[in-house]
A protein has these predicted regions:
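Cell-wall polysaccharide-cleaving catalytic domain and substrate-binding groove, primarily
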Residues: 1-86, 95-180, 184-189, 193-212
Length: 212
């Protein structure tokens, strides 16, 4: 990794980067309010001064993974030493996750507009819940589907980019619909229309975007 902590802090300001981190958290099952305090198996811990480094027996699997991005203790320690991270606070976890994305060779392709599925494939060896090009976990564990992850990523990046009070559907091949806070249209009807348009978009564009 040639980047510094300051570099990753800067990259974190990119809404698309935050959407990617949110997607990884969603795949790992830590997207809730306690994500940064979540241990393997769903339990939580309070001390964010360091990685808890506690092995949890989940029955089929045993793991010491913890935090929003389910860091293994040795992995987090290694990245912390390289970047000068002195705690396990949310910001430190975000920076460390970006460093792992970078280490897997996925950060530059992602920032450069690489296909979402290819980015997931690059990250699959780091996060078992992310799918390879074959749609399976790199480690044979439960995995999120690529379509599910892409929809979640789009929902996160769209929410971050859209102006407050306005959600616009893309106009290529579908009718454009706006929901504006000023006009207060019939929300149920608009929501139904947007669901239809979303399905049309997924069918029209997803095969060209994601390598299934």
């Amino acid at each position: 990794m040639g980047r510094t902590r300051a570099d990753y802090e800067r990259i974190l300001q990119n809404p698309k980067t935050r959407a990617l981190l949110n997607t990884i958290s969603y795949a790992e099952g830590t997207s809730g309010p306690d994500g940064y305090r979540t241990m393997f198996g769903g339990g939580t811990f309070d001390d964010l001064s360091r990685h808890p480094d506690r092995v949890i027996d989940g029955g089929r699997y045993r793991s010491a993974a913890a935090g929003r991005y389910q860091f293994m203790p040795d992995t987090y320690q290694e990245v912390s030493n390289q970047l000068g991270l002195s705690d396990f606070q949310p910001r430190s976890q975000d920076v460390a996750a970006l460093a792992l994305i970078d280490r897997r060779g996925a950060l530059d392709p992602f920032l450069g507009g690489e296909k979402f599925g290819k980015v997931m494939n690059l990250l699959a060896p780091e996060w078992a819940s992310l799918p390879t090009n074959e749609g399976a976990s790199y480690y044979g564990q439960p995995v999120k589907g690529i379509g599910d992850l892409y929809q979640y990523y789009q929902s996160q990046s769209g929410a971050l980019d859209a102006p407050t009070g306005t959600v616009a559907a893309p106009t290529s091949g579908v009718t454009q619909v706006f929901i504006k806070g000023d006009d207060e249209p019939k929300k149920e009807k608009a929501s139904s229309l947007l669901d239809v348009f979303k399905e049309q978009l997924m069918q029209q564009f997803l095969p060209n975007i994601l390598p299934f």
